[in-house]
């Protein structure tokens, strides 16, 4: 790791501004999955042990950036944080302004303060407003720590602009260090072979960069979900009313051509579950891709033979990376394909198995397989960008390591 890490700082009796990623799923005021909060705890505990005053900042959801919206308040996070820390955690009513400055002034060494949602202000996401917003945030701390791996592919103020105000004093947190070192070592530098990547999700265009990068790394590329139908249509298959990105068809053909040149095996679904609508009670059937999907039906999950083929390849692999569900996992029975992939990864302890955050991580959690996977990343988009480029904007601006 060529960036400064939190262990290289001297934060005793100092204020440390920590960017965390507490963008957790919330329903009716309750957090459904707190893995992102749990993942940040090692850094928070480390700083508290060093008698630092810890100032946490995060975003949650997609508020309009026009001020406080109760729906997106970080208040539900406070209860979970307090449970892990065993003491009261004040929530500043805002992240900037007089109330925030007062809250920061009152925080003492060995305690934690959580600032309210960064995205309540346009300064977090809009570059033209970054300077003033970042200047105020950076005034709160003596040191800056980025532990928000899942957000570090975005050039937002708290991730990209703020650390530049801390020359020699901005560092990666323990979660960030773990993510970069695991993904870098096992997927980029020296993956054990055979190396298989599984990509799902809807759009080819949004993942074309990482797909082309993976074609230089992997032995097998398994494609499913909406993306899979775009590739199938590019091969002239009848996909009925399935989700297809028409503008991605040429990209798919390019990928298929490059894969052939590089001797990478691309594997697409050979059968799929189809129905007239994506609802739990809908009547569904399985059809083979060679047979073709009728025009009034859409593919919603991979079929039984595809599951068997995918799992056969996974079982024969030494490194597996999975990003994106292979079906509409939110709606049973179209979750069966994704659940089968999760269980297949879990029963392969001798392999390095990496789940690239986002929906795939949610599937693994639903399947109860998280503990059996080598690494579940806290960042979907961030893990893809790191695999594509080998770096993230939010880490490039951190101070160089002194070691």
UniProtKB/Swiss-Prot annotation:
It holds the Pfam family PGK. InterPro entries: Phosphoglycerate_kinase, Phosphoglycerate_kinase_CS, Phosphoglycerate_kinase_N, Phosphoglycerate_kinase_sf. Keywords: ATP-binding, Cytoplasm, Glycolysis, Kinase, Nucleotide-binding, Transferase. PROSITE patterns: PGLYCERATE_KINASE (PS00111). It catalyses: (2R)-3-phosphoglycerate + ATP = (2R)-3-phospho-glyceroyl phosphate + ADP. The keyword Nucleotide-binding applies. Substrate binds at residues 21-23, 36, 59-62, 119, 154. Its main location: cytoplasm. GO terms for cellular component: cytosol. ATP binds at residues 207, 299, 330, 357-360. Its EC number is 2.7.2.3. PANTHER family: PHOSPHOGLYCERATE KINASE (PTHR11406), PHOSPHOGLYCERATE KINASE 1, CHLOROPLASTIC-RELATED (PTHR11406:SF23). This is Phosphoglycerate kinase. It comes from Chlamydia abortus (strain DSM 27085 / S26/3) (Chlamydophila abortus). The gene is pgk.
């Amino acid at each position: 790791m060529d960036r400064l890490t939190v262990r290289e700082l001297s934060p005793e009796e100092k204020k440390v501004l920590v960017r965390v990623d507490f963008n957790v799923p919330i329903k009716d005021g309750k957090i459904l999955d707190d893995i992102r909060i749990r993942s940040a705890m090692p850094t928070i505990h480390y700083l508290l042990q060093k008698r630092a005053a810890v100032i946490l900042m995060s975003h949650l959801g997609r508020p309009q950036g026009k001020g406080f919206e109760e729906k997106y308040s970080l208040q539900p996070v406070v209860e979970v944080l307090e449970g892990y820390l065993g003491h009261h955690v004040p929530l500043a009513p805002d992240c900037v302004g007089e109330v925030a400055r007062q809250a920061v002034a009152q925080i003492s060494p060995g305690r934690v303060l959580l600032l309210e949602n960064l995205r309540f202000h346009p300064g977090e996401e809009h570059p033209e407003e970054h300077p003033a917003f970042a200047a105020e945030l950076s005034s709160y701390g003596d040191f800056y720590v980025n532990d928000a791996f899942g957000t570090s592919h975005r050039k937002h103020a708290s991730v990209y602009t703020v650390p530049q105000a801390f020359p020699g004093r901005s560092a990666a947190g323990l979660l960030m260090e773990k993510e970069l070192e695991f993904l870098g070592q096992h997927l980029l530098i020296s993956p054990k072979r055979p190396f298989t990547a599984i990509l799902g999700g809807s759009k080819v265009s949004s993942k074309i960069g990482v797909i082309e990068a993976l074609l230089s790394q992997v032995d097998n590329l398994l494609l499913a979900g909406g993306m899979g139908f775009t590739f199938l249509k590019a091969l002239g298959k009848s996909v009925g009313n399935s989700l297809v990105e028409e503008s991605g068809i040429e990209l798919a053909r390019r990928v298929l051509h490059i894969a052939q040149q590089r001797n990478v095996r691309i594997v697409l679904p050979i059968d799929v579950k189809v129905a007239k609508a994506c609802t739990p009670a809908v009547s569904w059937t399985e059809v083979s891709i060679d047979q073709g999907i009728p025009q009034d039906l859409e593919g919603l999950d991979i079929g039984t033979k595809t599951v068997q083929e995918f799992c056969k390849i996974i079982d024969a692999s030494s490194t597996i990376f999975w990003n994106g569900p292979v079906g509409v996992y939110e709606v049973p029975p179209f979750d069966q394909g994704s659940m089968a992939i999760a269980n297949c990864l879990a029963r392969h302890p001798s392999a390095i198995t990496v789940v690239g955050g986002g929906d795939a991580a949610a599937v693994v959690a639903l399947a109860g397989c998280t503990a059996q996977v080598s690494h579940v990343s806290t960042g979907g988009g961030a893990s893809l960008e790191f695999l594509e480029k080998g770096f993230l904007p939010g880490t490039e601006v951190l101070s160089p390591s002194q070691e």
